[in-house]
Amino acid sequence: RRLNADKNILYWEIGRLIKQDLYSKETTLHRIDTFKYLSRELVERYGKEFEVRHLLQMELFCVYFPELEIVSDLSKKLTWTHFLKLFLIDNKLHRDDYAKACKEEGWSSSVLHGKIMKLII
């Protein structure tokens, strides 16, 4: 559990840095090139978990869950897969409610996915 929580926080921090650095400085086209360059560098050093799509997910993590304290608390029970499923929910209130339910009721990521699909449909 501790490793999982640390991984979630690492991904959130990377997302925060990406958001902070790229949103303020880059146009959309430059952002894409920067993501590709950053991804190449990180994949070469640390492996495939830093491919472009993963970096985009990390950035989204910081956007959807902007408070580190909340991420830290949720990460005690939720895996990265839980967070990826929560990204499917556009409505912040619904997303927060589902995250809280996952934590309190111990939903697996599969159970969460099923409940989200019912919400979306």
Predicted features by range, described:
Residues 1-121:
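Basic, low-complexity intrinsically disordered segments
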